[in-house]
UniProtKB/Swiss-Prot annotation:
Gene of this entry: ccdc102a
The entry's keywords: Coiled coil
Pfam family, one: Myosin_tail_1
Protein name, as recorded: Coiled-coil domain-containing protein 102A
Pro residues bias locations: 46-55
Signal peptide positions on this chain: none
GO terms for cellular component: myosin complex
Biased composition (Acidic residues): 506-524
Coiled-coil zones: 68-167, 242-490
Keyword Transferase among UniProt keywords: no
Keyword flag Coiled coil: yes
């Protein structure tokens, strides 16, 4: 992509940049135009306004001059209209570039927001995965503890039953039937009391029915009572751990739902970004078409201006030829022709010397141009200074020459007035040329900005594609986590404990209790 400072090749190759009127146009020095670098668009020292020409008494009919002035004025008006049109097009291009910059800034801000939110989602996913691993480990530890507690309870129940059976053997055989009934009732009451205590620990308060105190009737040993109290404490701790695990799982479910909602919102944002990208592509195509149309119009305008320029050059050449003819005709009328011719010869010699110097300078410039661009600029500045000094000397010589011809001012007043008008027109033409060159520079800058805009849109499209891929990967990871959570769902732990710990008769007694469902761990 070309830089904004480099002119386009179309502008460099235009002959308008290589043509300029200077002080040496009347002295036949065409080599001076070659001093300017073809890539530079800065005005050359040749654009210095020329010194007034030698007043020559000429008798010219007024009708021809008026018609020529009218033609020149028309051409100047046309050139001004073209310059105004080019200014309008450049303003339109500047407005378009400003609008596109605003849109690109919005798209960049949205892209940065999407990146930040994606990073936040990743960090939250990592935290949730770590929490899930910790909860799994705690769950396994709780399961092992519950298994140990269940075994301890079964062992203690066996001991209690053995003690009860020993007491019954010591009593009379007549009351065997009653004793068996009492032992069964005591065992059932003991089991019920243990279960009720577990439910009370879980619910955090007393049970609905009063707790039976049949432990005193059984009269267990002190070791058994201490073990039972220790088991109760361990059961309390396990219940608390299970409740905490349940709360953590509920929080995890809520966070997963929030993340799913956020992912759906991100999907909607991605769709909106895709729509905006499509609209931007459409607008870019329209802008390209308009740009091509404008370039075609500008090229046509440049061709028209080249034609106008060539016609003006032809007319100027004709005027110069007429002036030379008038000089030749009027030279015979004056007696001081020889003196003027000698001065002219001196001037021509000086001009020849200047031509030779210019040729030498051109050769030096070509050598230095190959070596370095910086040296070229310095040499050009020195050459421009020398040329400016030579122009000053020539203007001084012409001024002295004009002093010698004061007696011819009366007859050449009309001719000098016409010359001043021509000079004014030429200065206006130069201003218009400079304006056209500036407009060409701005046009090149607009083309470069358009290229930069296209590259930025491609980059934004790549980043949007990468962001969509990242969002899809995050969604896949979330689905994987949800599937793992579903796979890890196990049957309630306390349901297994109840089935293994109690007999079928006890299960029938406890089936109607509404507090039994609170002991089950609900895993989503």
């Amino acid at each position: 992509m070309s830089q904004s400072s480099d002119p386009s090749p179309r502008l460099v190759e235009s002959p308008l940049l290589l043509q300029s009127s200077d002080l040496f146009c009347n002295l036949d020095i065409p080599q001076l135009e070659r001093i300017r670098h073809p890539d530079s668009l800065t005005p050359s020292p040749n654009s210095v306004p020329p010194s007034p020409m030698l007043p020559i008494p000429v008798s010219v009919p007024n009708g021809d001059w008026e018609s020529r002035e009218e033609l020149r004025l028309r051409e100047l008006e046309e050139a001004r209209a073209r310059a105004a049109q080019m200014e309008k097009t450049m303003r339109w291009w500047s407005d378009c570039t400003a609008n596109w910059r605003e849109k690109w800034s919005k798209v960049r801000a949205e892209r940065n927001k999407a990146r930040e939110e994606g990073a936040q989602l990743r960090s939250r996913l990592e935290i949730l995965s770590k929490e899930l691993g910790a909860l799994k480990r705690e769950r396994q530890e709780a399961a092992t503890e519950t298994e140990q507690l269940r075994k301890e309870l079964e062992r203690l129940q066996g001991k209690a039953r053995v003690l009860v059976s020993n007491d019954h053997d010591i009593e009379e055989p007549v009351r065997d039937v009653e004793i068996e009934k009492l032992t069964k009732n005591k065992d059932s009451d003991l089991d019920n009391s243990v279960r009720l205590e577990c439910w009370e620990i879980q619910n955090g308060g007393p049970s609905r029915s009063p707790r039976p105190r049949n432990w005193e009737d059984v009269s267990p040993s002190e070791d058994d009572t201490t073990k039972i109290t220790a088991l109760k404490l361990r059961l309390d701790e396990s219940q608390k751990v299970l409740l905490k695990e349940r709360e953590d799982k509920m929080l995890l479910n809520k966070t997963i739902e929030k993340m799913e909602a956020e992912i759906s919102q991100w999907k909607m944002k991605c769709e909106e970004l895709n729509k905006s990208r499509q609209e931007a592509v459409k607008q870019l195509t329209l802008l390209r078409e308009r740009h091509q149309d404008e370039l075609g119009r500008i090229s046509e305008d440049l061709q028209d201006e080249l034609g106008v320029r060539s016609s003006m050059d032809k007319k100027l050449a004709e005027l110069r030829a007429e002036m030379e003819g008038l000089q030749a005709e009027n030279a015979e009328e004056w007696g001081r022709r020889e003196r003027l011719e000698t001065e002219k010869l001196n001037l021509e010699r000086e001009n020849k010397k200047l031509r030779l110097q210019i040729q030498d300078l051109e050769e030096i410039l070509t050598r230095k141009r190959r070596q370095s661009a910086s040296a070229l600029d310095t040499d050009l500045k020195s050459i421009q200074a020398e040329l400016f000094e030579k122009n000053k000397e020539l203007s001084d010589l012409r001024h002295s020459h004009s002093k010698l011809k004061k007696q011819y001012h009366e007859r050449s007043s009309e001719f000098s007035h016409a010359n001043r008008r021509v000079e004014q027109l030429e200065s206006e033409v130069k201003k218009l040329r400079l304006r056209v060159e500036e407009l060409k520079k701005e046009l090149g800058q607009a083309e470069d900005e358009l290229d930069e805009a296209q590259n930025q849109i491609r980059k934004l499209q790549r980043t949007l594609d990468e962001q969509t891929e990242l969002n899809e990967n995050l969604q896949v990871q979330l689905e994987h986590v949800q599937s793992r959570l579903r796979r890890q769902q196990n049957p309630p732990l306390f349901g297994k404990l109840r089935a293994s710990r109690f007999s079928n008769d006890d299960a029938v007694d406890l089936g109607s209790d509404p507090d039994e469902d609170d002991l089950q761990i609900q895993v989503p």
